[in-house]
Design a protein with these regions (language model features):
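Membrane-lumen/periplasm interface segments of specific transmembrane helices
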Residues: 208, 212, 386-473, 477-482, ...
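Hydrophobic/aromatic-rich transmembrane helices and adjacent perimembrane loops
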Residues: 82-84, 140-151, 478-531
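Specific aromatic-rich, kink-prone transmembrane helix
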Residues: 295-298, 315, 326, 334-359
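Signature aromatic-anchored transmembrane alpha helix within multi-pass, membrane-resident enzymes
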Residues: 119-126, 196-202, 393-397, 523-561
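Transmembrane-helix motifs of polytopic, lipid-linked glycan transferases
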Residues: 95-105, 279-303
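Perimembrane helix-loop-helix junctions
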Residues: 181-186, 372-398
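Start-transfer (signal-anchor) and selected internal transmembrane alpha helices
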Residues: 2-17, 21-52, 90-95, 106-126, ...
Length: 680
């Protein structure tokens, strides 16, 4: 029989059932021929997942129901079906596109498709973006967000690293003209572009926080503790007052030195003298915190290169714990970060004499920053800078012990300041910080119990999530965590120590970024002969850190949105409403009636407005020898009794403006009853 006849007979014998069998066997044959089954499954799953994730991202970006859907799982059935159909459709489209590419059976098509799928794998996470960049979803769910971001960040890093490795293999050592052009551009601009990026970030930070903290102050939202305290100390310092006088806390007699050795105030004095108001300190703080980006960049550039260093410096200005500390009035620890990093850079670059000056300035910021500087010396010892590291540890450690244990207690009649923050670790029969150390060393079970508190777990998550805990990848990270561990985590029942809205985060910020730089540098080292992936490992972590910094800064920080940031004890109020502006004008009309050097006692939020004088007292502590009384109605419970007592004795109402009352000792009391009736 002719061959053509045989073909016709065979064709006629094909049934629909046989067609399905032939198609299935053809697909299996195609897959078996082109790639092993595990690789085929991985490739097709990745393609489907990327398509589905893009669908989820598109729906999330356009839908107005994302918040309710995330928080309550509430979504109308048609919308829910649309979401699933969209994800399946785009996932299926990506899958079919991959199969179509395979069917063409070009040379190395299977491997090329597999590499393409791996290169696209970071897009698996794109579907999360609409959820991560909606702050409403995560209100009161900070721990959930932190754990989610940390775990997702680790997975994202794995996908980025695999993607970079696949890209290298796909190029097979051949650089495209575009990549060569980009590489040449980055190299040509490396002398100026990275430092420009750092400068823009630092300038944006300084301007943003200067403006908003000043506005916050002018909305009467700063407090006697601690804005008024620090403003009064600086005013007395530049006017030749008693050593470290702080009248809002101690009254007419008393020195702040017993609580904190902030000798750095003498450095701030000349700047404060230019404009003797609390606003000067707020601007100074914002600028100093921003300037710390420069020594961090300079140090990092020596170890990981200029471009990566610029990204690390920008991550610093976006770091939420930095924002929280800056938003809470004015404090010294955030200022110390600049000098710790400057000391590190100067030692690292061989400028030892300048490093010693920077070290002394770091110690002068506050006594606890001297302890931090001593730990910096230990890091230098382990970083092959043994001699300068040993000097720094010895000098800074001796300074801390001498100032804290010898010089400061006499100013508090022999007591040790802030021991109450660790009081739970002082055993019966023990006393002072020696008792704390005895418990930490001799009773690890009790110490561990005090550490395992929900607030501390959340605190660590918020500190580490922007890095996916990368800072603790190597033992050096734990050495650098000693200051934060002692000054925050060991605290007992004092919540400000373990909240990112207080100044104590500086003990972590100063060292976690050093650990990040150290770990990134180590990633470049070959792990075995012929290991050429060090650059890929470093780049993968850099990309991960940048992405996580953006997410966490948006959620916890202050610069991208102003709904969730906290400063001090509560949510931070940005801007100045018309009501607050009017209240500011009213209180300053009354302040204008008070002589510049008259002794005045005021409500908590008014003290910072009048603390630039020799004696400005806090009403909730007492009247002391004040000549004037300035308070707001309705008065706080801890202020009302003193204000009422004053008006019932020898203070007379001078004037009222809105809810504010000004009274003077010995003044006519004819208006007192009107005010007293409102106070009952």
């Amino acid at each position: 029989m002719p061959a053509s006849t045989d073909s016709s007979v065979n064709a006629l014998s094909v049934t629909p059932k046989n067609q399905q069998q032939f198609a299935a066997s053809g697909v299996r044959s195609l897959l078996d021929k082109m790639m092993p089954l595990p690789s085929a499954v991985k490739t097709l799953v990745l393609l489907f997942g990327v398509g589905a994730s893009i669908g989820l991202c598109g729906w999330g970006a356009l839908s107005t129901a994302v918040v309710d859907y995330s928080q309550k799982n509430e979504l109308p059935a048609p919308d829910r079906n649309l979401l699933i159909e969209l994800m399946l459709a785009l996932g299926g489209t990506a899958l079919l596109a991959g199969l179509a590419f395979l069917a063409r059976a070009q040379q190395n098509a299977a491997r090329r498709l597999e590499l393409a799928a791996v290169r696209l794998s970071p897009l698996l996470f794109i579907g999360l973006l609409p959820f991560l960049f909606r702050w409403q979803i995560w209100v009161s769910r900070e721990l959930t967000l932190g754990v989610f971001v940390s775990a997702g960040g680790i997975a994202f890093h794995a996908s980025v690293r695999a993607s970079l490795r696949a890209a290298e293999e796909a190029r097979a050592g051949v650089e495209s003209p575009f990549r060569r052009s980009v590489a040449a551009l980055l190299e040509r601009s490396a002398s100026w572009a990275p430092i420009t990026l750092v400068s823009l970030g630092a300038a944006a930070y300084a301007l943003f926080f200067s403006y908003h903290t000043v506005q916050h102050h002018r909305a009467l939202l700063t407090s006697s503790f601690d804005m008024g305290l620090e403003d009064n100390l600086l005013w007395n310092l530049i006017h030749g007052g008693p050593f470290m006088k702080m009248s809002p806390l101690f009254g007419p007699v008393g020195s702040h030195f017993g609580y904190h050795a902030t000798l750095f105030a003498y450095f701030i004095g000349p700047f404060y003298a230019l404009y003797q108001h609390a606003e000067t300190l707020l601007v100074f703080q914002a600028v100093m915190v921003a300037l710390a980006a420069y020594p961090l960049y300079l140090f990092a550039a020596r170890h990981v290169g200029r471009w990566p260093a610029s990204l690390i410096a920008v991550a610093y200005v976006l770091y939420p714990p930095v924002h929280g500390a800056n938003l809470y009035d004015f404090h010294y620890p955030p200022l110390g970060v600049f000098f710790i990093w400057m000391t590190l850079y100067l030692v690292d670059s061989g400028r030892i004499q300048w490093a010693m000056i920077s070290m002394l300035l770091a110690c002068s910021v506050r006594e606890d920053m001297a302890a931090d500087t001593a730990i910096l010396g230990l890091y230098l010892i382990f970083s092959r800078q043994a001699r300068p590291g040993a000097i720094i540890t010895a000098v800074a450690g001796a300074y801390f012990l001498f100032v804290k244990m010898v010089l400061m207690p006499p100013f508090l009649h022999g007591d040790q300041s802030f021991l109450n923050q660790w009081q739970g670790l002082v055993g019966r029969g023990s006393h002072g910080y020696a008792g704390v150390l005895m418990t930490v060393i001799g009773n690890p079970v009790f110490t561990l119990t005090s550490l395992l508190e929900p607030e501390k777990f959340l605190y660590l998550v918020q500190l580490g999530a922007p890095f996916a805990f990368f800072a603790w990848r190597r033992p050096i990270g734990y050495l650098l965590s000693i200051p934060g561990f002692f000054f925050t985590l060991l605290g007992t029942k004092y919540l400000p120590l373990v909240q990112i809205s207080f100044q104590y985060t500086a003990h972590w910020t100063a060292f976690l970024f050093i650990a990040v730089v150290s770990n990134l540098e180590r990633l470049r080292e070959a792990r075995f002969p012929g290991d050429g992936e060090g650059f890929l490992r470093q780049r993968a972590w850099l990309i991960t850190l940048c992405c996580l910094s953006l997410v966490c800064s948006y959620q916890y920080g202050a610069m991208f949105q102003q709904h969730t940031a906290r400063g001090g004890f509560g949510p931070y109020e940005f801007g100045r409403s018309e009501t607050n502006a009017r209240r500011y004008d009213q209180v300053h009309k009354l302040i204008a009636k008070v002589p510049p050097r008259a002794k005045i006692v005021s409500s908590e939020n008014i003290v910072p407005q009048v603390s630039n004088r020799p004696d400005s007292y806090t009403l909730r502590i007492g009247l002391s020898d004040a000549e004037y009384l300035l308070f707001q109605e309705p008065a706080r419970d801890d202020e009302r009794r003193f204000a009422k007592s004053a008006l019932e004795s020898d203070f007379g109402v001078v004037a009222t403006e809105g809810s504010f009352v000004l009274a003077k000792r010995g003044h006519d009391k004819s208006d007192n009853q009107r005010v007293l009736r409102r106070m009952h």
